[in-house]
Amino acid sequence: MKRYHFVTALLCTLLSLPSFSQNTDFGRGEVPVTIPSGYNSAEETPLIILLHGYGSTGERQDSYLGFSRIANKYNFLLVTPTGTRESSGRQATFWNATSACCNFQEPSIDDNAYLMGIIERMKEEYNIDSNRVYLVGHSNGGFMSYQLAYNNSETIAAIVSLAGASHADKRESPEHAVHVLQIHGTDDSTIRYEGGDIQGNDYPGANESVSQWAEY
């Protein structure tokens, strides 16, 4: 009976352990990486990349979406990178996704290569399930999620775009299908539900974005 109580107490302790967060330099400075307490290098684990909106940061995005707080419950690895800071003006952080959003100053920034480098590095250091690599992006991060998935459909299994949008230009279908969830408020005045433009560069609406990917 004492042994039973000891094992039960040990299991309860292990299950209540918090996820572990560490910083890793993926080439542009340190980035928070959350590792669930139940991570086992012998088992494949899903990976989520959380992409912030224009002017925000990875840590700030996670602070109100709370992905790191549920990493243990759903057993996934989480990376919350921060984009490039503008060199003048607002000096806001951004992802170079499409012509509409949101690279207004630094045309040479290659966020596709940077983010894919993060995914590849994570695969080298952890046992990542290659069939469960996901992107979650808010606003500008949603734009970036669409673009990363389009350019790397063999790697990205699914994306969630929160008030983001896909590309407005006509393109061939990506090589592989990608699951898409678009969440968008109809009263959004920044990235409009029905679509619009930013500094003269068009972006599709929420319905058009998901219809585009459904046709792919």
Regions found by a protein language model. Name each.
Residues 190-194, 198-205:
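Conserved alpha/beta-hydrolase "acid-adjacent" motif
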Residues 1-7:
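Bacterial N-terminal signal peptides that target proteins for export
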Residues 24-134, 144-147, 151:
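Serine-hydrolase catalytic machinery in alpha/beta-hydrolase-like enzymes
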Residues 201-216:
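Acidic, glycine-rich loop-and-strand cores that form catalytic or ligand-binding grooves
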Residues 19-21:
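Boundary at the C-terminal end of the N-terminal hydrophobic targeting segment
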Residues 182-184, 188:
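Short beta-strand/loop motif that positions the catalytic acidic residue
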Residues 123-178, 189:
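Primarily recognizes the serine-hydrolase "nucleophile elbow" in alpha/beta-hydrolase
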